[in-house]
Curated annotation (Swiss-Prot):
Quaternary structure and partners: Part of the 30S ribosomal subunit. Interacts with proteins S7 and S18. Binds to IF-3.
A GO CC annotation given for this chain: ribosome
Molecular function, one GO term: structural constituent of ribosome
Keyword Ribonucleoprotein: yes
Organism placement in taxonomy: Bacteria, Bacillati, Bacillota, Clostridia, Eubacteriales
Source taxon at top rank: Bacteria
GO biological process terms, semicolon-separated: translation
NCBIfam families: PRK05309.1, uS11_bact
Organism: Clostridium acetobutylicum (strain ATCC 824 / DSM 792 / JCM 1419 / IAM 19013 / LMG 5710 / NBRC 13948 / NRRL B-527 / VKM B-1787 / 2291 / W)
Function comment: Located on the platform of the 30S subunit, it bridges several disparate RNA helices of the 16S rRNA. Forms part of the Shine-Dalgarno cleft in the 70S ribosome.
Record's protein name: Small ribosomal subunit protein uS11
Family: Belongs to the universal ribosomal protein uS11 family.
């Protein structure tokens, strides 16, 4: 008697119809992460330089941030996204490149805001590097 396999039914991602959203760009010295959300903060799509196959010091380049923003924008535009508010966080080199590639992908940028956390003299910073 043949044993029958249980077939798992995969649900397809439903296409949300969202016209305006937010793009959160986190650009550090090591990597760049782009998350596109709706106005409430629910993620529509995300992409990172490391997730696209960039390794080591190539993750922190402006080109890697550009590719990450492009990939996130394309998948978000499948949900009907047309315009975004951009929130940039971090001191990395991919900040401007990511914003430019969001515009090049066809999203209308309505606002650019820097939300980098700045301490009001909080924790003691790590000791200086001696190279």
């Amino acid at each position: 008697m043949a044993v029958q396999k249980n077939k798992k039914t995969r649900r397809r991602k439903e296409k949300k119809n969202i016209e305006h959203g937010c793009a959160h760009i986190k650009s550090t010295f090591n990597n760049s992460i782009v998350t596109i959300t709706d106005v409430n903060g629910n993620a529509l799509s995300w992409s990172s330089a490391g997730g696209l196959g960039f390794k080591g010091s190539r993750k922190s380049t402006p080109f890697a941030a550009q590719m990450a923003a492009e990939t996130a924008a394309k998948t978000a535009m499948e949900h009907g996204l047309k315009s975004v508010d951009v929130f940039v966080k971090g001191p990395g080199s991919g900040r401007e490149a990511a914003i430019r590639s969001l515009q090049a992908a066809g999203l209308e940028v309505t606002l650019i805001k820097d939300v980098t956390p700045i301490p009001h003299n909080g924790c003691r910073p790590p000791k200086r590097r001696r190279v």
